[in-house]
C-alpha cells in the first residue's frame, strides 16, 4: 500500500505538471471579450463585479496582480490564477479517480502489479481527458470564476474521500469541518461548488449505514435539503440579518455605524469557537 501511495502521489504531480504547462502556454495574454475584462479590472482595483459577486475570487486575483510588472501585465497574472486553479483541479481529479479505483481493486489489501497499473492508468486517462476537454480548457486559460470554482468542487469532493478513509478513527470529523470551510470559501467564488453537497451526503450515508433503498432515498433528500437551505436561506439571509442588527444598533441604541455588523460577526465567531470546543475538534 505504501508503494501505491508513493506512485499515486508522483503520478498525480506529473499530471499536474502536464496540465499546468498546457494551460500556461495556451493562456490568454489579455482580457477575453466577455466577463473576463470585468473580473480582471475589478480584481486589480478590488472593486465589485456583477451580482451576486465573487469577493474571494477578487481577493485572490488582487494577490496575483501584485506580481505584475505593470498594469499591462495584470490580465496575464489573473489569467495565470485560473490556469493554476485548473491544474490543481486536475490533480485532485486524478486522486479522486485513483481513490475509487483503489476501493474497487484493492479490497483485500493485496496490490497486484496489473491492478496497480490499471488504477493509475485510469487516473491518468480520466484526468488528462478532462484536461483537454473543450469547456474546461476554455475556462482554464482566462480570468473567470469557473476555473477557481472547479478547483473548490474537486477539492471538497476529494476531502470527503479522505474523510471516508479515516472515518472510524478519532477526530476524523476534522475533515468535515475542513469541507465546510472550503464550501464557505467557494461561495465567494461561484455557487456551482455547492452541487457537491448531495454527492458528499451519499458518501457519508454509505459509510455510516447499511444500504437500503429507503435509507439511500432519505439521505439524498436530506443532503439536497441542506443544499437548498444554504442556497436559499443562509447565503441571502445572512447579509440581510447583518443589516438588521446594524439598523437596530444605530437607530435604537444610538451606536456608531457598523457596530451591529461587528456584533453580528463576533456573535458568529463565538458560536463557531464554542462549537469547536464543545465537540473537541
PLM segments and residue spans:
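Extracytoplasmic catalytic/substrate-binding loops of multi-pass membrane glycan-assembly enzymes
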Residues: 27-39, 49-61, 76
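Start-transfer (signal-anchor) and selected internal transmembrane alpha helices
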Residues: 1-22, 88, 110-124, 267-281
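Transmembrane signal-anchor helices characteristic of membrane glycosylation enzymes that use polyprenol
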Residues: 5-33, 130-132, 190, 230-233
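Membrane-interface transmembrane helices that cradle and orient dolichyl/undecaprenyl
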Residues: 113, 117, 156-175, 203-214, ...
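Short hydrophobic alpha-helices at membrane interfaces in multi-pass membrane enzymes
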Residues: 121-124, 159, 166-184, 213-225
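Transmembrane-helix motifs of polytopic, lipid-linked glycan transferases
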Residues: 13, 80-112, 155-159
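Aromatic- and kink-enriched transmembrane "portal" helix at the membrane-lumen/periplasm boundary
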Residues: 24, 71-79, 104-119, 123-150, ...
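Transmembrane-embedded, aromatic-rich helix segments that form part
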Residues: 192-204
